[in-house]
Amino acid sequence: MIYAQILAGGKGTRMGNVSMPKQFLPLNGKPIIVHTVEKFILNTRFDKILISSPKEWMNHAEDNIKKYISDDRIVVIEGGEDRNETIMNGIRYVEKTFGLNDEDIIVTHDAVRPFLTHRIIEENIDAAIETGAVDTVIEALDTIVESSNHEFITDIPVRDQMYQGQTPQSFNMKKVYNHYQNLSAEKKQILTDACKICLLAGDQVKLVKGEIFNIKITTPYDLKVANAIIQERIAND
C-alpha cells in the first residue's frame, strides 16, 4: 500500500507571536495545511493520508480538514516528540491498524509546504517503490560554507555537488522503521533528517528534483512570499 503522511507536528516558534501552530495560519482564506492536503487528495495512488498533529491540536486539525475537504482516506493521528518520532508514530499506526508488508511505502511531507506539485509526488512514489528511500532537493544556488565553531569557516564544499533538501521524503516503511530502531538513543536525539537514518544504515537515497517555489513557510516573511505566489497564480488563471 501507499501512504501519505503530512507532518503537522511543529509548534511554529519561528513564526513569532501567533496564537496557533503555523500550519493552521490562514493562506488566502484557508489554513496552510488545507492547501497542502489538497495536493495529496488529487493523487489516487494513496490508500491513506495521515495527518500527524500535536495532541492538543488534533481536534482543531480534524475540524479544519472537515470544513474544507471531504475524503475518507484522511485520518488525523498524534505526532511525536520530534520529526523522526512523528514519522515513526505514523508507521506504528499503520502497522497496528492495517498491518505492514515489505512493499508498503510512505511519502512524508511538511504541512507548511503547500506548493508541491503532482510531478514531485509521482516521482517520490515511483522512486520509493524502486529504491526504498527518496529525498526531494533543489540545486544549491548560493555557496555553502561550513563552520564547526560557528565563528570561522572550516570548509567550503564544491557548490555543484550541494543540494538543498525539501520534502517529500519517501521510504519503504519497514526498512526505515527497522533502521530507526537499530539506532542508539544518542543518535536518535541528534538526527534531524529522516534520510540520514537510511544513510547511516548504508542505504542509497534517491534524489528527486524539487522546485524553488516548494517553499517551507516558517517565518512571517515566508508567509508573505506564499501569499504573493498565490496571488500571482490567481492573476494568471
Curated annotation (Swiss-Prot):
According to its UniProt record, the EC number is 2.7.7.40
Q: Reaction(s) catalyzed by this protein?
A: D-ribitol 5-phosphate + CTP + H(+) = CDP-L-ribitol + diphosphate
Which residues, if any, are the signal sequence? none
Q: Name one GO biological process term.
A: poly(ribitol phosphate) teichoic acid biosynthetic process
Q: Which InterPro entries match?
A: IspD/TarI, IspD/TarI_cytidylyltransf_bact, ISPD_synthase_CS, Nucleotide-diphossugar_trans, TarI
Keywords attached to this Swiss-Prot or TrEMBL record, sorted alphabetically, are: Cell wall biogenesis/degradation, Nucleotidyltransferase, Teichoic acid biosynthesis, Transferase
Give the residues the record marks as binding CTP.
Answer: L7, A8, G9, G10, G80, E81, D82, R83, N84, E85, T86
Write down the position(s) of the site called Transition state stabilizer.
R14, K22
Site Positions ribitol 5-phosphate for the nucleophilic attack — annotated at R159, K216
Function noted in UniProt = Catalyzes the transfer of the cytidylyl group of CTP to D-ribitol 5-phosphate.
> Under what name is this protein listed?
Ribitol-5-phosphate cytidylyltransferase
The source organism is: Listeria innocua serovar 6a (strain ATCC BAA-680 / CLIP 11262)
